[in-house]
Amino acid sequence: VFHAVYAYRNPDGGFGHGMEPDTASPESQPLFSIMALETLDEVGYLTKEIILKDFMPYFENITTEKGGIPWMFRPKSTYPCEEHFKTVKEWSALSTTAPLLGILEKYELDIPWMKKAEQFVWSEFERIQDKHIFCYLCVPRWLTFLEYTKSRARANKTINDLKNWI
């Protein structure tokens, strides 16, 4: 599984090459990189060293001023992709930043990047209360963060808020 996932890895440390079937673009994408991280975690091949050495340099490099990582970047190549990827907004996203933070917490990592990212995630949970869920995969990714964050009282309140919201 490890080698199958890493076949999608690019020299910049991100993952691309159509890892998600809606685009065949070889370019690294934040979402694909999160998918790779989640897959390695799920099958038991993820370690602190892999997170810090192979994943975090890419994520730190694409972090926005707000402290989060984008969901996707518009493909720069002419490879086939669904229309929604051609018009994607390249701003920080809860659905990519929250699971990354959750995995960092799960593996008991504490790196400087996490502070601003955590502020971004909590502010997004506040902001989304009047929005709609546009992706059925978003909520489970948010729960990764809420399950592992050290801020238990705040996480429990947010989970209850999400239950009411959904």
Predicted regions span which residues?
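Preference for long, amphipathic alpha-helical scaffolds in soluble/luminal domains
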Residues: 1-166
